[in-house]
């Protein structure tokens, strides 16, 4: 049963079903992450039924995609119904986040199977992004995507295809952050990226950002970016990380770095240095997953045991403990002590 309605959303986009969009705006990305995991599992265990299911889903994704490469089920269904939903109209619709996880899943599929079917879909979406960034540079109208998985996804596209344009696109996407007007601490775009010194704002967004920057540096070294990565990593590990590897003490709060008379809301976020309460800890599971991505890439940049120590702390405590043994239930947040 499609409890999340994710597959049904793709079927509606592909014309296989009728109905309205339902579920979370990041559901497409969750589906792509499931696809990535399923691909690994199917070919490690030689599960023929799962292999067939994967190929059927790739066909569905391809038929849901628009001619220009765009693919976000909420927007496609909304455009057809005329309910006022528009492409790239709200960064909190997670469109580019979803793209990034599609890129990664498609690369895994190509590497394991040798097939181009999923990668061709991802390439068309990357073409759409390329046109989007060209337009942003031309008009100066730039907004930063939340939880920017596409940085890592585009670097993976480069590694998988060898096409330099994907690395260039990842570099362009990261550089465009500095052109955002009225940026926010919560989205890590209030000041230029190369001025970052402290971990702040939404914890998932932050960890995905620095994981993506580290991925870029693995392919094209940038001393300024590497310096930022080391400074912000120390800010996290020395002053804002829970003993369990939990990331982001606050559910809602005010940015500790906001200007007077410019108090900014932060959500699911890092707080003040050493602000690590037990009962009210938020510690979103997704943030620790982002931390694993980041720590792994820091280790590749600089093979020190500390990075894998932190990776294991996050993965074997917060991440592993957040999932039930039967795989059907999970914790979205991970406090250290529950109060009755």
Where in the sequence are the language-model features?
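Glycan-recognition and catalytic cores of secretory/periplasmic carbohydrate-active enzymes
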Residues: 1-340
